[in-house]
Amino acid sequence: GQRNPRHDLVNLSEAGGGLVALTGGRRGPLMRALRAGGALSARRVLDVLVDAFGRDHVLVEWQGARGDEDEVGEVLAELARASGTRLVATSGARMSSPSKQALGDILAANRLGSSLDEAEAHLGAHRSFLLSPAEMAQLHGAHPQALDNACEVAASCAFDLRLVAPRLPRTQV
């Protein structure tokens, strides 16, 4: 299934207050524009986000090179440089570890409103797990600044979960 946004760009940009806008992963608007219309089309999408949130609050997301995607990282790095935004390393993690794949698949099927069998085509060949620092460095080796930027963003967004007292299940990460 197609994902429908819960909030629109206008409402989010009006909220302001230090929101950070990631451009999205492989299925996000920037990558869709890049695949459909090339770098110029992707730049237009990036410009819309910069106009809405400001260049300091827009982060060009790069999930790392898998297969023949090295050139995509170069294009994204150049888009970030040219727009004055930052390239950030991400992994698109959906699960904490490979042992949680079955649970992650069930949650994805639920989100899609389909059975597990029907959702199989949407789960992708690369299941996404949290990666170690060494794995992230290997995945994003061509763009070490993206790793540094991701660490800075994570530090600025970090907070103590005990402050909101959620009842989360204990899990090993």
Name each model feature, range by range.
Residues 1-173:
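Phosphodiester-processing cores and adjacent nucleic acid-binding clamps
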